[in-house]
């Protein structure tokens, strides 16, 4: 067994032990988010999970916050994107997707996110099926959600319909370090699919948290078709 003898050796030993604990915390949180990321596979469901971190203090006080994943299903604006197949969600299309219906959907989404948080809004909200930056800007700046000051990152996938995934985050609980899209190569003759979103951030306790937002094909056509 190694026993540090001088004050300098003791200080170095404490520093190395502290760094080791921080690395362990990062690994634990990473796997916590992997489990939460699996929940993104369930469309139309809202899944909330509590994540805990420890403050770097003598009391080891726990910091908890809520992580939510939600397939909000076809959050399109009312304008045609010539590069995407979004014709179904236009004012003169079969769904009559006009500005009034669009604003109502924004308000409904904002209301649900706020209600999930109860007294404390979710720190992280993974969203599936958002069309573009415009709808996220409207959701976070022009809906009741604007009071919560969410910021967001999103993918820009080659999906033919133009739907993407995104992550909303509270800046006072999650400091964004990086974000990137992970492309999924088309399999044989299959059409392009949605990218994965990988986001890294820093928690209040100094731990690093990695989040993966995924939106895999539905099984509406059967398991064999989706695979």
Regions found by a protein language model. Name each.
Residues 1-22:
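N-terminal secretory signal peptides that target proteins for export/translocation
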Residues 2, 48-95, 99, 170-227:
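Active-site regions of metal-assisted phosphoester/phosphodiester hydrolases
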Residues 12, 45-46:
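Short, low-complexity intrinsically disordered segments enriched in small and basic residues
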Residues 27-42:
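Bacterial N-terminal signal peptides
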Residues 46-147, 153-163:
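N-terminal, active-site-proximal structural segment of metallo-dependent hydrolase catalytic domains
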Residues 149-184:
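Extracytoplasmic mature domains of secreted/periplasmic and thylakoid-lumen proteins
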């Amino acid at each position: 067994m190694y026993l540090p003898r001088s004050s300098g050796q003791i200080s170095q030993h404490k520093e190395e032990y502290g760094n080791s604990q921080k690395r362990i915390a990062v690994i634990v949180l990473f796997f916590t988010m992997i489990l939460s990321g699996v929940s993104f596979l369930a469309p139309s469901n809202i899944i909330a999970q509590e994540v805990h971190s420890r403050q770097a203090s003598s009391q080891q006080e726990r910091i908890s916050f809520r992580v939510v994943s939600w397939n909000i299903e076809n959050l399109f604006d009312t304008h045609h994107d010539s590069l995407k197949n979004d014709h179904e969600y236009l004012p003169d299309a079969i769904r009559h997707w006009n500005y009034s219906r669009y604003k109502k959907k924004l308000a409904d989404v904002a209301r649900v996110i706020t209600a999930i948080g109860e007294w404390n809004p979710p720190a992280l909200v993974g969203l599936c099926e958002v069309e573009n930056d415009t709808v996220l800007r409207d959701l976070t700046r022009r809906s009741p959600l604007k009071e919560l000051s969410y910021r967001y990152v999103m993918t820009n996938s080659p999906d033919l319909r133009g739907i993407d995934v995104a992550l909303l985050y509270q800046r006072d609980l999650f400091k964004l370090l990086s974000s990137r899209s992970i492309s999924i190569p088309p399999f044989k003759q299959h059409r392009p699919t949605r990218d994965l979103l990988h986001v890294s951030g820093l928690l209040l306790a100094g731990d690093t948290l990695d989040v993966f937002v995924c939106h895999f094909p539905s099984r509406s056509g059967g398991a064999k078709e989706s695979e």
